């Protein structure tokens, strides 16, 4: 006899080379990043960036779901931005799959009105270095004599 499937979705957020993967399932409102609570995310200055989806939508929308976030790659700032994007995308996906479409549209509109990067990844990437200079665009100084 098969066990009943748990209501869960998996979403990712990206910023530069940082990737955050969120497992969102029915629960009590716990949000953990790499095993520790989201309240302990470092650096403290950027902690509220990770909290933005929660503060925008209100804690009541997160009470019924648990989120486990694994983040790797990139720097501290990029990781925070990847975390906030994956939280927002996971909640929208959870609402679409297990709650009604009207609530999902409401959540998505609130997030889009505040900041589009909460749901849409930033496509900019670091340009590779070329020969003839120190970086991607700068060239070595040219001498005529």
UniProtKB/Swiss-Prot annotation:
Record's keyword annotation contains Lipoprotein: no
Record bears the keyword NAD: no
GO terms under cellular component: cytosolic small ribosomal subunit
Gene3D superfamilies referenced in this protein's UniProt entry, alphabetically: 3.30.230.10
Disulphide-bridged cysteine pairs: none
Gene Ontology terms: biological process: maturation of SSU-rRNA from tricistronic rRNA transcript (SSU-rRNA, 5.8S rRNA, LSU-rRNA); translation
InterPro entries hit by this protein: Ribosomal_Su5_D2-typ_SF, Ribosomal_uS9, Ribosomal_uS9_CS, Ribsml_uS5_D2-typ_fold_subgr
UniProt GO molecular function: RNA binding; structural constituent of ribosome
Location in the cell: Cytoplasm
Record keywords, A-Z: Cytoplasm, Ribonucleoprotein, Ribosomal protein
Family of this protein: Belongs to the universal ribosomal protein uS9 family.
Name of this chain's protein: Small ribosomal subunit protein uS9
Species the sequence originates in: Fritillaria agrestis (Stinkbells)
């Amino acid at each position: 006899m098969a066990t009943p499937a748990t209501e869960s979705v998996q979403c990712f957020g990206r910023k530069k080379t940082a990737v955050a993967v969120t497992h969102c399932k029915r629960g009590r409102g716990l949000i953990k990043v790499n095993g520790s609570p989201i309240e302990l995310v470092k650096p403290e200055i950027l902690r509220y960036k990770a909290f933005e989806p929660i503060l925008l939508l209100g804690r009541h929308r997160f009470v019924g779901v648990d989120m486990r976030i694994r983040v790797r790659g990139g720097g501290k700032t990029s990781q925070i931005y990847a975390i906030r994007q994956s939280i927002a995308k996971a909640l929208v996906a959870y609402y679409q799959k297990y709650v009604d479409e009207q609530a999902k549209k409401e959540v998505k509109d609130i997030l889009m009105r505040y900041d589009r990067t909460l749901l849409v990844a930033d496509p900019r990437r670091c340009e590779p270095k070329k020969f003839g200079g120190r970086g991607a665009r700068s060239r070595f100084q040219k001498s005529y004599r």
